[in-house]
Amino acid sequence: MKKLVILGSTGSIGKSTLSVVEQNKTEYEVFGLVGGKNVELMAAQCLLFQPKFAALDDENAAKALEEQLRQLNVKTEVLSGQKAICELSAHPEVDMVMAAIVGAAGLLPTLSAVKAGKKVLLANKESLVTCGQIFIDEARKSGAQLLPVDSEHNAIFQSLPPDAQQKVGFCPLAELGVSKIILTGSGGPFRVKPLDEFAAITPAQAVAHPNWSMGKKISVDSATMMNKGLEYIEARWLFNASAEEMEIIIHPQSIIHSMVRYIDGSVIAQMGNPDMCTPIAHTMAYPKRINAGVAPLDFFKLKELTFIEPDFARYPNLKLAIDAFAEGQYATTAMNAANEVAVEAFLNERIRFIDIVNVNRTVVENIAPVQVKEIADVLHIDKLARELAEQAVINL
């Protein structure tokens, strides 16, 4: 049995991962669960999966969890704090780590798993958006296997030749006959909404994604298409792709999850119902296949598959992300941090939907260029960017 640690088990990806484990109980043992502050859900997960360890970032929450597990007579050992979470990610008994903590909080535990040479199922966008070069270099050093969980990157991975799959982060696309990596996106809930109505968009409207079931933050990112911008940055790192080798297409039905175009005219696409359990199951079992508990795609129920060129006037955050990559890691790190602050401010009704990009742009334009050599540099830029973003929110 493969031993699994789930970083972010109480979040959307974490819960879907546990759902896949339930479908394949003889294949996987949940060795460790990691969360933030959600004591009730973590206690329920521990009761059901009986992991050896459970860790919460918040010390008070960890104490509350310990008490709940004692009352439930669950023997799981409770840990707390970043150091303990990083040690759990690198534990010698662990075979694979699902890296699904949202935001900068997931950086150190994910890097810890990479440095320990684990099979890392990468669902934490920020790892590559802020530390792409660091992660790729460390994976090459340690022999860690990076497998992308994001549906789009997983689709690209599946559509690439086996040689490229073995060289994530440094695959020579041109040598393998790859002409373009085609990243698809639904366009979010406001794809056809008149632009003059954007100022009145509410948080409730923004989190209602038409195709995918996701957390609030990623749903807002999908509405602004910042999500696609972050995925563009990720794809460039994961697949060693130049700007010329990247293409973004809006595909409203979310049936084709992404594609790879080859120099002989072929296009290979990965298709399926929009359910995160599919890419999760693929990464967990790779190179084999397991049951994900997902209904098969019924082609006779598909009315149409449509494709649209992205409009940067509608999605200025997408353009900002593409431009930030060209500037360097300091810019993508600053943009990512600013976006977390801006989205949180929007969800709390402190700023309007159309102000999210203004906060992000202000931060990227005002952050001083710095060479990113280590995680400490990233965390420093992240902190500065959050302070600038908070000030930008106040100034609006």
UniProtKB/Swiss-Prot annotation:
Its annotated pathway reads: Isoprenoid biosynthesis; isopentenyl diphosphate biosynthesis via DXP pathway; isopentenyl diphosphate from 1-deoxy-D-xylulose 5-phosphate: step 1/6
Top-level enzyme category: oxidoreductase
EC number of this enzyme: 1.1.1.267
Query: What would be an example GO MF term here?
Result: NADPH binding
Q: Please list the cofactors this protein needs.
A: Mg(2+); Mn(2+)
State where 1-deoxy-D-xylulose 5-phosphate binds: K125, S151, E152, S186, H209, S222, N227, K228, E231
Q: Where does NADPH bind?
A: T10, G11, S12, I13, G36, K37, N38, N124, E126, G215
Which Gene Ontology terms describe the biological processes this protein takes part in?
Answer: isopentenyl diphosphate biosynthetic process, methylerythritol 4-phosphate pathway involved in terpenoid biosynthetic process
Q: A Pfam family matched by this chain, by name? A: DXP_reductoisom
Identify the Gene3D superfamilies for this entry: 1.10.1740.10, NAD(P)-binding Rossmann-like Domain
Is Protein biosynthesis among this UniProt entry's keywords? no
| Sequence positions that bind Mn(2+) | D150, E152, E231
- Tell me the protein family, please: Belongs to the DXR family.
Kindly give the HAMAP family that the UniProt entry links to this protein. DXP_reductoisom (MF_00183)
Record function comment: Catalyzes the NADPH-dependent rearrangement and reduction of 1-deoxy-D-xylulose-5-phosphate (DXP) to 2-C-methyl-D-erythritol 4-phosphate (MEP).
Protein name, per record: 1-deoxy-D-xylulose 5-phosphate reductoisomerase
Q: Which organism is it from?
A: Actinobacillus pleuropneumoniae serotype 5b (strain L20)
Q: Which lineage?
A: Bacteria, Pseudomonadati, Pseudomonadota, Gammaproteobacteria, Pasteurellales
